[in-house]
Amino acid sequence: MKQEIRYQASAEVVSFIHRWQNWLKDERRYSLHTLDAYSRDLSVFFDFLKDYLKRAAERQDLASLDVHGFRAFLSARAARHIDKNSLAREISTLRNFFKWLNRSKILKNEDISVIVNPRRPKILPKALDVTQTFNLLKKSEKNQNW
């Protein structure tokens, strides 16, 4: 990770986050880039929770967080005009973290599974114009067989 990421959470919750990060790195073999992105997403979530709860999040807060809390987070992110692809990754991060908490028997909260990813625009490949097509054909004729 590039620089230390701080989490607005109790020491106990921060220890869970570090264990989850180690699990992602060691057992799931996530790249450092992915781990960094997931860690930053989780930091943003805990920053939101601090404002939402008016204090640093604790274990029982994570266990009792309902669908409305998760949707409030997504609404706050959407209000800041966060790209839908980034929102989808943040939801994926939260699902992954809460699933790990459940599997590790730390706490159970399945409300995140109700949240659906935002619809992302489907971008079709752009067609080549006539000049580009002829240039491509000329280049392929120049290549020799293996």
Language-model features: locations:
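Conserved catalytic core of the tyrosine transesterase superfamily
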Residues: 1-146
